[in-house]
Amino acid sequence: MFCHLVFVNLDPTAPALADESAFLSDEIMSYAPDLANLTHAHTLTYRIQANWKAVVDNFLECYHCPVAHRDFCTLVEMDTYKVKTHGIYSSHMAKAGRGDNKAYGVESASVTDHAVWYLWPNTTLMRYPGRGNFMVWRFYPDGPEQTYEVFDFFFET
């Protein structure tokens, strides 16, 4: 168990995720203290005609956000958006939950920050403004030009 989630490594000699990821657990639990109480609500799977490394690289930068994700940029205070790299993971944090945004309603939101963690090599953990939530996003390569993305959504009930 790691942050109330199950991670499996089939290599019996591999170091523990907690040892490899330094403060990731503390960081996640500080932004998502309700994680143990969230319920799995839905899974989405997409097939993308792109190399998985290009998909991950695109995710890891937000230079394209003002053009490709305009509503997201009204939800998140982009001038506070910071990316920090910590060994095998990176943190993407910003103040968020602006009531005047164009993305979706956040009135009475219990989550008011945008917090995302990319865990090398193919997992992203996300917390968006709104009601209690958490998303796990995985990238699976299927050849040099195709990637499967799987999103698991967890919400408060």
Predicted features and spans:
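C-terminal catalytic domain of Rieske-type non-heme iron oxygenases
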Residues: H4-T157
